[in-house]
Amino acid sequence: HPRPYVDRVNFNGTTLNMNGLKQTLNIKKVPGYENFDWGDGEAPDNEYDGLYNSGSFPSGHTTKTYNRGLGLATLLPELGPELVARAAEGGNNRVVLGVHYPMDVIGGRIPASASVTALWSDATFRQNVLLPAHDELENYIAARCKADGNGDTVAACVSKTGANDKNGYKNTFTDAVSTEPVTDRASAIDAYTARMTYGFSQTSAAGQAPVVPQGAENLLLTAFPHLTDAQRRQVLEASEIDSGYPLDASSNGFERINLAKAFSAKVTLSEDGSTITAISFGAKAPTVVKTASSKDTITGLLTDFNKYYVAGKGVTDEGKSVLAHDDQLT
């Protein structure tokens, strides 16, 4: 498919068959802003005109910006929503420049998500490269934060400086898709979510069961290290947008998972930690809490007392063992 600014009526001396689509969108290519010497022996130029003959789908620059943005978010999950929203902005810039269509950008995000997932799912690469990189980055930032009096950890620093709120990533740009400026975490998540579909209508069945790509749970390993793989997959399931949007059917779930939301999840576990009882999004940090015990203090004391003493029978064997141990200590 040709670039948006291509003259489809007179492209290299021919008229392109657009199968009923508009012959021109009246989009003008932004002029190159510099003549760069690429060191290839040719006269310096921006080589922008070479895009005329290249296809539009998918956007390779979008794949790169999401690849870097999603990758960095896994290394610094405390700012995950902001980093992936910034990646979405990079993809959107390709539309603003008039060199790609929104569908190209969606098509660029999907393989980037898949490639970062593949890296985190490679146990050797994860152990030898990604986790050490995560630790090095966290330790460096924590040391700088401590030196500046902003706490001893990245989480404390992010909270104190407000980098996960109104003092963090901002962008005043708005358009027909992302209608509100990014001013805090909530609006960053909204911008990312809007750019997942670009306002397209659903082209296949809505309301289908969630689909989480194999290994995608590893994207949340640093954000939720104490959850199981299955529980991290549940977080991704809960983050997903609805089914049926363009490219969903062929994406194996990568079109749907919303990593801006997932990195802001508050996960509530059962008292024993085995079951997720609730998931909400928009938290200032990746958070895991446990359901409070249903037993009140008096009930708990009575339960413990009955383990050691039974009315009509006296001290139990377990109680005698405790008393004997107490005698040894005293």
Regions found by a protein language model. Name each.
Residues 1-96, 132, 136-143, 175, ...:
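Hydrophobic alpha-helical bundle signature of multipass membrane enzymes
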